[in-house]
Structures are given as C-alpha cells and as structure tokens.
Amino acid sequence: MTTKTAPAKGEWLEAWDPENEQTWDKSLAWRTLWVTTFVLTLAFIAWFLPSAIIPKLNLLGYSFSKGQLYWMAAMPGLAAGLLRLVWMVLPPIMGTRKMVSLTSLLLIASTLGWGVRVQSPTAPYWELMVLAFLAGIGGGAFSGFMPSTSYFLSLIHI
C-alpha cells in the first residue's frame, strides 16, 4: 500500500481564479508571465535556429547531400509535432515549474549545441540530427505552453 504525500505549501496552487480579487496574486501572475515569456521566446529561437543554419552547413565545410540536409531541416518540425502532445500532457502531471525548468535546460543545450558544433565541420550527421530533434522541443513547448499562459492573468486587474 502506498501513500501519497501532500505537496508542500506554496508548491501547488490550491485555488486560482484570476477574476476573483481574493484568490488572485498579482505579483505571482506577473512573475509567471515574465518567466513564461522568456521560455517561450527561447523555445521559438531554438526551434527556428536550425532552419537558418542547416542550409549553410555545406558552406561551413560540411559535405552533406541534399537529402541529408532536407531531413535535418525537417526534423525540428517533425519533433515539434510529436512533442507538442507530450508538452500538453506533462505539465499537469509533473507541474509547470518543473516542466519550464526542464524545457529551459533542453532548449539551452540544443541552442548551445548548434553554436558549438557548427564551428568545426567534424560533427557526424547523427549528432546534428539529434540537435535538430532537440530543437523541435522548442516548437512542441511553444505550442504546448502558449495556451496556458493566459490563465494566470486577468484583463480586469491589469
């Protein structure tokens, strides 16, 4: 028999109604908006970055075929479509704070990975495909987080 421990105070929102002044916390709402906006911007940058870099890889010294470049450029979009489903389902399970932290780390890893690997044309195809897949996290996170951002703010109180 397993028992579930209650979340610590402050870890979960017990009651959140942005239209009710008694339960609405303006500072938490604005802090959430700023953090979410930063992560959404990072997600969009990470998702867009490969589409700007991949067509220039052969000019940087790589020797990929057109087919390889096509699949590498398609991977972020394919991954985003798949990962959107994951990023819509996981926040209620893991908690938004943990998901935003995990997403930020993965997006920073992807973005830095592209920045490092294009400087020397020795990266194998599979490694750049992994980076392209990780960049798709940006698209999945962007489309998964964007709809929930408006839940924290009330137009009445702004």
Can you say where each PLM-predicted feature lies in the sequence?
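Cytosolic juxtamembrane N-terminal segment immediately preceding the first transmembrane helix
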Residues: 1-39, 43
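Extracytoplasmic
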Residues: 31-62
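Central cavity-lining transmembrane alpha-helices of secondary-active solute carriers
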Residues: 74-89
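C-terminal ends and interior cores of transmembrane alpha-helices
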Residues: 106-121
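Hydrophobic core of transmembrane alpha-helices in multi-pass small-molecule transporters
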Residues: 125-140
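Intracellular juxtamembrane helix-capping segments at the cytosolic ends
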Residues: 141-153
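Conserved small/polar residues in nucleotide/adenosyl-binding loops
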Residues: 156-158
